[in-house]
């Protein structure tokens, strides 16, 4: 027996009284008391045992029916238990509204998601189960709501799930509903492109709906009064708008007004900008009093541009190699590792500069200036092709570069470098505030495609860095400095850059990354107490297959129960009255048992005859201490010999 100790957020005493099937039954009783028709949606439809279940209330249109999607409103049973009067009032008001579309309230079980037992991932939740059982996702759209335990004043609107995002019509209706009620709100996932690129993973419950083709949005209320925004949303919903599916949008809220930029406006902006860029590059680059020298430099050294790009990509691979093989870097947190990769890239680029000086290759401001403008312009179109909403970020960077292109003094170059960072700061802050440690590895141990994209983003900054090195060389007024002295200036400058990157990594880790990831991992402590879990298997070989019944008995209510069957010979399970997942090796089956199972239940399954297997049952129990959980495991070896 083991004890798992963890430190979750505090829960109210009231909420702890009902869990699992008891909470589902309470939900039914409250709906029945309020005269609402409902039906039960089983999470584990075995027909024998009572597990937690979803409860569905469907409200038909009160106006003549039109071709409209059904609005799904999902509320966890835990939240319903906390705020029954307010939620029942919302259902009643919705029922009385004049609507031309159906509404379904779904009270979901087991949605108070937790990570107590990270080693066991195959557990059911009401929202995912409901979404996975919809026949045709295109006939629905969903609004998921939950109530935050934290007391901050603003409600939150979530617009991404997995790599998918809420369409503009649904986001706009929701935002307008909050604004019209003067309810303060925030949108943590405004930068949709980060999620669509797979750098961050959006809300898991929303992802379950997007997977089934259901458009959705999620609202998190910090105060129960904020639910009036949802009421306003239902009242003012216009079914005809849900035909639009524009997900490439952005918006800005100022005071009580919102400015939306849809996909059409983004495309139009890219086209106009493209004409301006061509004008700047072709017509203006080779004009002025130095036009003849500029043309001469370009014709002689244009191959230097792809060479620099290759050097930039190569520098990232060197940084990546060091992060993987140097222990003091590889053991650091992911933010520090990524910062180290960037710093090593700066060192490699600095060495490349020394190589240029030694071979007397071009180090003129014009060549560097033309390269940075060309690549920043190319970035606009390359990244806009991937996601058009990032156009504004790279366009702003381009204008900063263009209007500071003639900077030659050291201070002006540093200011230019700092200004170029501004368009990306919000992306950096959002990314490191929400990324998980395994996901950030995509930037540290990157493949060819990711390193090329990183290189294109970093390239303008690397060029400004080289322009700074050129300027340092000019400051000394001795262009015939020895390579040793130039190297000294270069690496002193690189040390300054290293200090800046280190400071940035420290501040990001301390005030952004750790705020999201600073939790204490569960601890497993060995202990021996009386047994709560008992298991027994009965086999029957009367048919062509071996039929087995696994009886599980528990002295007290378990929080979670996991069951897996492994066989070293054949497929471990051929059929069962419970859903199960056969793992990659095809020799282990993991059963999907909802949390808070009955104290006594049976699993029926069939296997091939003459197949030996090991059945492992693990149950987790609460203790007198709220922060402790017992873990008991029972393993049974079943011989492949004929059942007796």
Predicted regions and their residues:
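Detector for Asparagine
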Residues: 2, 48, 54-56, 114-115, ...
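Extracytosolic and intramembrane catalytic regions of membrane-associated proteins
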Residues: 21-59, 67-68, 520-644
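Soluble extramembrane regions of membrane proteins in the secretory/endomembrane system
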Residues: 1-259
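Acidic-enriched, low-complexity/disordered segments with a strong bias for Aspartate over Glutamate
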Residues: 35, 49, 79, 104, ...
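Transmembrane catalytic cores of multi-pass membrane glycosyltransferases
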Residues: 242-252, 259-279, 319
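Context-gated lysine
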Residues: 14-15, 19, 33, 69, ...
């Amino acid at each position: 027996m083991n004890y798992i100790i963890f430190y979750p957020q505090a829960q109210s005493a009231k909420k702890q009284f009902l869990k699992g099937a008891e909470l589902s039954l309470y939900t039914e009783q409250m709906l029945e008391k309020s005269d609402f028709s409902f039906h039960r949606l089983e999470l584990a439809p075995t027909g024998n045992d009572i597990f937690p279940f979803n409860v569905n209330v469907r409200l038909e249109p009160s106006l003549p029916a039109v071709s409209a999607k059904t609005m799904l409103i999902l509320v966890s049973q835990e939240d319903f238990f906390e705020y029954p009067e307010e939620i029942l009032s919302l259902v009643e008001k919705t029922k009385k509204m004049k609507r031309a579309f159906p509404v379904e309230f779904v009270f979901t079980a087991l949605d108070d998601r937790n990570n107590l037992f990270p080693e066991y991932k195959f557990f059911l939740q009401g929202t995912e189960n409901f979404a996975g059982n919809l026949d045709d996702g295109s006939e629905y759209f969903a609004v998921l709501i939950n109530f935050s335990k934290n007391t901050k004043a603003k409600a939150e609107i979530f617009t991404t799930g997995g790599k998918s995002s809420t369409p503009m019509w649904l986001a706009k209706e929701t935002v307008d509903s909050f604004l019209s009620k003067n309810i303060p709100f925030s949108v943590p996932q405004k930068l949709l492109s980060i999620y669509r690129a797979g750098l961050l993973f959006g809300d898991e419950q929303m992802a379950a709906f997007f997977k089934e083709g259901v458009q959705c949005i999620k609202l998190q209320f910090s105060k129960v009064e904020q639910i009036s925004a949802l009421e306003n949303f239902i009242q003012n919903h216009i079914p005809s708008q849900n035909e639009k599916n524009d997900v490439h949008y952005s918006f800005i809220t100022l005071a009580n007004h919102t400015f939306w930029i849809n996909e059409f406006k983004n495309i139009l902006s890219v086209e106009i900008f493209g004409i301006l860029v061509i004008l700047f590059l072709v017509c203006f680059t080779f004009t002025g009093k130095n036009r003849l020298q500029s043309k001469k430099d370009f014709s002689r050294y244009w191959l230097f541009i792809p060479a620099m790009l290759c050097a930039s990509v190569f520098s990232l691979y060197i940084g990546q190699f060091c992060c993987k093989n140097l222990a003091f870097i590889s053991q650091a947190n992911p933010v520090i590792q990524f910062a180290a990769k960037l710093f090593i890239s700066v060192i490699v680029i600095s060495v490349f500069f020394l190589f240029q000086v030694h071979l007397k290759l071009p180090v003129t401001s014009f060549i560097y200036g033309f390269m940075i403008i060309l690549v920043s312009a190319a970035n606009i179109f390359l990244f806009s092709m991937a996601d058009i909403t990032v156009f504004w970020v790279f366009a702003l960077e381009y204008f900063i570069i263009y209007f500071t292109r003639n900077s030659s003094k050291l201070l002006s170059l540093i200011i230019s470098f700092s200004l170029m960072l501004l368009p990306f700061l919000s992306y950096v802050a959002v990314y490191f505030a929400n990324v998980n440690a395994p996901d950030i590895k995509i930037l540290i141990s990157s493949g060819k495609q990711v390193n090329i994209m990183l290189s294109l983003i970093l390239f303008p900054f690397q060029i400004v860095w080289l322009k700074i090195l050129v300027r340092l060389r000019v400051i000394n007024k001795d262009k015939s400095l020895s390579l040793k002295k130039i190297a000294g200036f270069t690496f002193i400058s690189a040390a300054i850059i290293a200090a800046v990157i280190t400071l940035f990594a420290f501040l990001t880790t301390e005030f952004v990354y750790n705020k999201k990831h600073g939790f204490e991992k569960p601890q497993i402590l060995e202990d021996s107490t009386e047994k709560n879990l008992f298991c027994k298997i009965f086999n029957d070989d009367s048919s062509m297959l071996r039929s087995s019944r696994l009886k599980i008995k528990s002295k007290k209510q378990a929080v979670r129960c996991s069951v897996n069957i492994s066989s070293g010979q054949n497929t471990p399970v051929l059929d069962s009255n419970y859903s199960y997942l056969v793992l990659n090796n095809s020799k282990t089956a993991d059963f999907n048992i909802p949390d808070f199972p009955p104290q006594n239940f049976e699993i029926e399954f069939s296997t091939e005859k003459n197949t030996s297997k090991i059945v492992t049952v693990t149950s987790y129990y609460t203790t007198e201490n709220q922060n402790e959980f017992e873990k008991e495991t029972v393993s049974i070896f079943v011989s492949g010999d004929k059942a007796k």
